[in-house]
Amino acid sequence: MRILCTNDDGIHAPGLKIVEDIARALSDDVWVVAPELDQSGVSHSLSLNDPLRLREVGPRHFAVRGTPTDCVIMGARHILADKAPDLVLSGVNRGRNVAEDVVYSGTIAGALEGTILGLPSFALSQEFTLETRNAPLWDTAKAHGPEILRKAIKAGVPKNTVININFPACAPDEVAGVQVTRQGKRNQGFLRVDERHDGRGNPYFWIGFERVAVVDMPAEGTDLAALAAKYISVTPLRLDRTDEAFSATLAKTLG
């Protein structure tokens, strides 16, 4: 089985080594194509106005000056053009990708691009807390990742579906189990705009994350609830985002 690994944290990110270790537990035909620079939060962006630069950094290891989407395309359509990958793994992201994170995540986008190309694809992320922020518990993803992937692959991932896996911020032996979940929703916005000023007094801005207290417990069955209870969250996500339930109502209203 030929496996293509990517991420959004960049070619030198520690989580990329973890996803490579997970891949090597499944196969010895593992290829890494990852962004030259950190691409966190770029979602499914595609480089159309700038050329892509490709650099070989080691055997079967390539850096692309582009997004995770660019990397998967370069890997599947150029580097591995002679024999396409059988599986795409994107991660392991430093930090969870749940709830609204899904629409911002470059990690998930890398896996989505693999799905668009017709390849079974998985996004993997490791949650951290304030205490483990500088040293995420990578061993949790490394210990549990291979078996989850084996079972999910055996089950047969449907076309147009990507599997989003999030590992809780606890030691491997503290994991409560595995839950198949749905995408959750936070009870309030979590992004803020910080205004600052340069040496000439001109304003500039950073988008940051609010540290907000949890008002309500996450809804049962969601990715948020699973991680809060130290379960590994496995969420099937579909490429088709059509709201079927609202379609009939909208059709009536529009005549």
Curated annotation (Swiss-Prot):
Catalytic activity: a ribonucleoside 5'-phosphate + H2O = a ribonucleoside + phosphate
InterPro entries (UniProt xref): SurE, SurE-like_Pase/nucleotidase, SurE-like_sf
Cleaved signal peptide residues: none
Cofactor binding notes: Binds 1 divalent metal cation per subunit.
Sections of the chain in a coiled coil: none
GO cellular component, one term: cytoplasm
A GO MF term: 5'-nucleotidase activity
UniProt keyword list: Cytoplasm, Hydrolase, Metal-binding, Nucleotide-binding
Class in the EC hierarchy, top level: hydrolase
Pfam families in alphabetical order: SurE
Binding site for a divalent metal cation: 8-9, 40, 93
EC number: 3.1.3.5
Gene3D superfamilies associated with the record: Survival protein SurE-like phosphatase/nucleotidase
TM stretches of this protein: none
Swiss-Prot/TrEMBL cofactor(s): a divalent metal cation
Record localization: Cytoplasm
Functional description taken from the UniProt entry: Nucleotidase that shows phosphatase activity on nucleoside 5'-monophosphates.
Family as reported in the entry's similarity comment: Belongs to the SurE nucleotidase family.
Protein name per the record: 5'-nucleotidase SurE
Native source species: Rhodopseudomonas palustris (strain HaA2)
Organism lineage string: Bacteria, Pseudomonadati, Pseudomonadota, Alphaproteobacteria, Hyphomicrobiales
